[in-house]
């Protein structure tokens, strides 16, 4: 199984935008090389999470080893390392590219280059990978291979004269792709004699074996039973099981430089074997780890609360289990006066947040209330201390802080030119600064904006898609923190601030947001027995208010005629009762009210 010389190993990945046919192409490669028998074949073979198949995206990385006999009658081993295509998971992409020597750049021949593909191609170029352009879906009636070739040449600067025309669905061009992987992708360097260094590019939690780590051996050899050390976390483990992914797991006794495989070593949590960490032998350690390890930092935060307070322990267990599989997920307990006990969770981006929420609800049967997403603000206090705050309710008062800075991102949008106007409006309305605009090919344009991340995390992506009828695509990356006149907007219901409705907003937008919020809450909160004032305030200054009138019983119904003082006495008595009720009564804020905060920005 592992006696193939290094010169006949090829490690490659597939770079493609969502829906450009990456998973189908991977299926065809597995089928053509006979790695997966036809009867076991199912659509999207490598996307084995139910959610991935449903959304048609790749979330967790997969790897597969294929044996292939090339036209020169030699047997080769091709290791496909699958990458997630979504912008939230770009760190995972960079690690899996670091484990390869080549990449297939798959572009839909009817759509052309999209923004996410660009971001990943630039990562591949940084890692010095050999890039093979493949134009997929050429069987579609709308395919324009010549236009797309020109587009790739102009945007990415790759020579497309040898681009492969393929259709993963019908199997056209698959043999050519396999041949070009063998002939164009360089073999790994033969460094079997060096001390062991292996790069972790993925890990997942298995109920019986603990964490199973996927890795690529860069230097040296690893054998079953070796004691290994993970350089970033400093932990040591014994390798109980070692194997290759074909794409199901097949055990082997040793793996040498250039190979891709997995090992299990009774590791308790994925945090101990983080993506990007370097594996080395405990007794013969490598001098330095492989470059490029970064701890994935959450960018978007939100509160998660169970609708039923009794489900709090279940939510905690569910988060612990997801955390085993997802080192980028952060959470800590928090309490809210309105919603009881819950967790403050951190995510890589909006898609990551949605996926975690959906997995909690689907796999663990939880009903959750999610607060509005927020980002990490940097606050400098008057004493000169720097605080990082992800929850608006923990923002210090204005008299204690010198300045607030918020994270900014650069957003690159690629769009057909007829939507440029509406997308520029969108950029301006989100406090964006226009930076650049290039015409890629006739009819397609790229727009570059700098925006506060807070404006991107709410619903920027959805708005961009709806304004461009789904044709535009975007990618964003962090460019640093900038100072802005930000204020904390508090919502008071019956004179009590509701911490889960608080938000940090730009001063110029505060009145508009406050006004919109209170009028929305007025519609959503049901009437009570007493009058409920709803106010939006900045500090002690109320900037907008509405009130919900009381429900009242007609206490005069049984007075027929009679003295006016009798009626007055009954009305006074009712008034006193309402007053007492108002001072002790609690207002129930329904779940829809919290969701309203998320939607205010759309209107």
Curated annotation (Swiss-Prot):
GO CC terms in record: plasma membrane
Record-annotated disulphide pairs: none
Molecular function via GO: GTP binding; GTPase activity; ribosome binding
Record has Signal as a keyword: no
Highest rank taxon of the organism: Bacteria
EC number: 3.6.5.n1
Limits of the tr-type G domain: 7-189
Membrane topology: Peripheral membrane protein
Record-linked SUPFAM superfamilies: EF-G C-terminal domain-like (SSF54980), P-loop containing nucleoside triphosphate hydrolases (SSF52540)
Keyword entries, A-Z: Cell inner membrane, Cell membrane, GTP-binding, Hydrolase, Membrane, Nucleotide-binding, Protein biosynthesis
InterPro entries: EF-4 (IPR006297), EFG_III/V (IPR035647), EFG_V-like (IPR000640), EFTu-like_2 (IPR004161), G_TR_CS (IPR031157), GUFP (IPR027518), LepA_C_sf (IPR038363), LepA_CTD (IPR013842)
GO biological process assignments: positive regulation of translation; translation
Similarity comment: Belongs to the TRAFAC class translation factor GTPase superfamily. Classic translation factor GTPase family. LepA subfamily.
Annotated protein name in UniProt: Elongation factor 4
Organism (species): Acaryochloris marina (strain MBIC 11017)
């Amino acid at each position: 199984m592992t006696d193939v010389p290094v010169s006949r190993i090829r490690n490659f990945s597939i770079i493609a935008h969502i829906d450009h046919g990456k998973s189908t192409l991977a299926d065809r490669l597995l089928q053509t090389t006979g790695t997966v028998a036809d009867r076991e074949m199912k659509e999207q073979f490598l996307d084995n999470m139910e959610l991935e198949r449903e959304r048609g995206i790749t979330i967790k990385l997969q790897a597969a080893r294929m044996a292939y006999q090339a036209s020169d009658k030699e047997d080769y081993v091709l290791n496909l390392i699958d990458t997630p295509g979504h912008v939230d998971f770009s760190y995972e992409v960079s690690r899996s590219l670091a484990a390869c020597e080549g990449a297939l750049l798959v572009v839909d021949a009817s759509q052309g280059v999209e923004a996410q593909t660009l971001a990943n191609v630039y990562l591949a170029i940084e890692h010095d990978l050999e890039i093979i352009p493949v134009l997929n879906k050429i069987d579609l009636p709308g395919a324009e291979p010549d236009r797309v070739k020109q587009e790739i040449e102009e945007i990415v600067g790759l020579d497309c004269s040898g681009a492969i025309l393929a259709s993963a669905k019908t199997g056209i061009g698959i043999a050519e792709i396999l041949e070009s992987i063998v002939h164009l992708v360089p073999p790994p360097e033969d460094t079997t004699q060096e001390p062991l260094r292996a790069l972790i590019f993925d890990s997942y939690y298995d109920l019986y074996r603990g964490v199973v780590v996927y890795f690529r051996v860069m230097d040296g050899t690893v054998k079953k039973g070796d004691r290994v050390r993970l350089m970033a976390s400093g932990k040591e483990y014994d390798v109980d099981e070692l194997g290759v992914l074909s794409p199901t797991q097949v055990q082997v006794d040793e793996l040498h430089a250039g190979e891709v495989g997995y090992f299990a070593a009774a590791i308790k949590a994925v945090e101990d074997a983080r993506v990007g960490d370097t594996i080395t032998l405990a007794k013969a350690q490598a001098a330095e780890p492989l470059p490029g390890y970064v701890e994935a930092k959450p960018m978007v935060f939100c509160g998660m609360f169970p609708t039923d307070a009794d489900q709090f322990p279940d939510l905690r267990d569910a988060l612990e289990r997801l955390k085993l599989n997802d080192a980028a997920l952060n959470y800590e307990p928090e309490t809210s006066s309105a919603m009881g006990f819950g967790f403050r969770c951190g995510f890589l981006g909006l898609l990551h947040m949605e996926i975690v929420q959906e997995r909690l609800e689907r796999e663990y049967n939880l009903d959750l209330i999610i607060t509005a997403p927020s980002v990490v603000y940097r606050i400098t206090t008057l004493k000169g201390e720097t605080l990082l705050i992800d929850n608006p309710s923990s923002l210090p008062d204005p008299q204690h802080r010198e300045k607030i800075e918020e994270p900014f991102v650069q957003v690159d949008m690629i769009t057909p030119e007829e939507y440029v106007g509406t997308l520029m409006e969108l950029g301006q309305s989100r406090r964006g600064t226009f930076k650049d605009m290039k015409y890629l090919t006739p009819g397609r344009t790229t727009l570059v904006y700098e925006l506060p991340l807070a404006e991107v995390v709410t619903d920027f992506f959805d708005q961009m898609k709806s304004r461009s009828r789904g044709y535009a695509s975007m990618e964003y990356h962090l460019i640093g923190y900038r100072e802005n006149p930000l204020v904390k907007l508090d919502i008071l219901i019956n004179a009590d601030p509701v911490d889960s409705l608080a938000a940090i907003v730009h001063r110029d937008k505060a009145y508009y947001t406050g006004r919109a919020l209170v009028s929305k809450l007025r519609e959503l909160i049901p009437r009570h027995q007493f009058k409920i004032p709803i106010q939006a305030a900045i500090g002690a200054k109320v900037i907008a208010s509405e009130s919900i009138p009381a429900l009242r019983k007609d206490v005069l119904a049984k007075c027929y005629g009679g003295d006016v003082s009798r009626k007055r006495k009954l009305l006074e008595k009712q008034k006193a009762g309402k007053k007492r009720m108002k001072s002790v009564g609690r207002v129930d804020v329904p779940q829809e009210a919290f969701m309203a905060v998320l939607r205010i920005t759309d209107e």
